[in-house]
């Protein structure tokens, strides 16, 4: 699979307080394509970030119901992947920002 297809699998990284504490354990969270599978995600992360992946966990996140100006709507359903890296590898999302 080409690198362009790998970039289509990973939507965006999830950067919250909870995932920041997970990154200390070499675990990183991403929103991924709803048809993504564990093996293809493992190859995509290794190819894009040049790291060694130990394990990939995937979960489906159901969209919440929200009210906006009296109209009830739902957020989109998403798929989330939590990627565990090998011991000496890490991903730097900040990119050297000071």
From Swiss-Prot:
HAMAP family listed in its UniProt record: Ribosomal_uL23_B
Keywords recorded for this protein, A-Z: Ribonucleoprotein, Ribosomal protein, RNA-binding, rRNA-binding
Official protein name in the record: Large ribosomal subunit protein uL23
GO cellular component, one term: ribonucleoprotein complex
Gene Ontology process terms (BP): translation
Pfam families linked to this entry: Ribosomal_L23
Domain of life from the UniProt record: Bacteria
PANTHER family named among the record's database cross-references: 60S RIBOSOMAL PROTEIN L23A
Subunit structure: Part of the 50S ribosomal subunit. Contacts protein L29, and trigger factor when it is bound to the ribosome.
GO molecular function per UniProt: rRNA binding; structural constituent of ribosome
Signal peptide: none
InterPro entries noted in UniProt: Nucleotide-bd_a/b_plait_sf, Ribosomal_uL23-like, Ribosomal_uL23/eL15/eS24_sf
Family membership: Belongs to the universal ribosomal protein uL23 family.
Function: One of the early assembly proteins it binds 23S rRNA. One of the proteins that surrounds the polypeptide exit tunnel on the outside of the ribosome. Forms the main docking site for trigger factor binding to the ribosome.
């Amino acid at each position: 699979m080409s690198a362009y297809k790998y970039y289509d699998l990973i939507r965006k990284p999830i950067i919250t307080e909870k995932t920041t504490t997970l990154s200390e354990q070499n675990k990183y969270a991403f929103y991924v394509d709803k048809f993504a599978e564990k093996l293809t995600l493992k190859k995509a992360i290794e190819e894009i970030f040049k790291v060694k992946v130990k394990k990939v966990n995937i979960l489906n996140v159901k969209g919440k119901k929200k009210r906006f100006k009296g109209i009830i709507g739902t957020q989109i359903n998403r798929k989330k992947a939590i990627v565990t890296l090998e011991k000496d590898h890490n991903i730097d999302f900040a990119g050297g920002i000071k």
